[in-house]
Amino acid sequence: NLYQLWKMILQETGKNAAPSYGFYGCNCGVGSRGKPKDATDRCCFVHKCCYKALTDCSPKTDSYSYSWKDKTIVCGKNNPCLKQECECDKAVAICLRDNLDTYNKNYKIYPKPLCKKADDC
């Protein structure tokens, strides 16, 4: 669910997810649409595509189990749907961490109407 995603992002990046990524670029957070602005925004685009690939799942509300061991996210024993949701969230948290150097404050609250049509997943 969103709380677990935000928690993973905080653990991996040290950034509070909602204010840092909630309106970032064209693909992070609310109203995501459009060609990614940078590598950070691309992480969110890939995450959105990961969620889209989940059929019969509710990734924004489902609750899965995971742990934080030795600074590593470990998805727990979940049903297949929950396992994949956890893996999607883990991947975006790691991607955001790996691209912290591309984080651009100018994209933190980016006007979505300026976003061009996105690539297909």
UniProtKB/Swiss-Prot annotation:
User: Which Gene3D superfamilies does the annotation name?
Assistant: Phospholipase A2 domain (1.20.90.10)
- Name the GO cellular-component terms: extracellular region
- Name the principal localization, coarsely classed: secreted
Q: Where expressed (tissue)?
A: Expressed by the venom gland.
Q: Name one Pfam family in it.
A: Phospholip_A2_1
Keywords from UniProt, A to Z, are: Cytolysis, Disulfide bond, Myotoxin, Secreted, Toxin
Q: Which PROSITE patterns match?
A: PA2_HIS
> Secreted: is it a keyword of this entry?
yes
- Per its UniProt record, what SMART domains does this chain match? PA2c
The biological processes this protein is annotated with in GO are: arachidonate secretion; killing of cells of another organism; lipid catabolic process; negative regulation of T cell proliferation; phospholipid metabolic process
The source's domain of life comes to Eukaryota
Where is the protein situated, by its record's location annotation?
Answer: Secreted
Q: Per UniProt, what is one GO molecular function of this protein?
A: toxin activity
**Which InterPro entries does the entry link to?**
PLipase_A2 (IPR001211), PLipase_A2_dom (IPR016090), PLipase_A2_dom_sf (IPR036444), PLipase_A2_His_AS (IPR033113)
Q: How does it assemble?
A: Homodimer.
Its recorded name reads Basic phospholipase A2 homolog
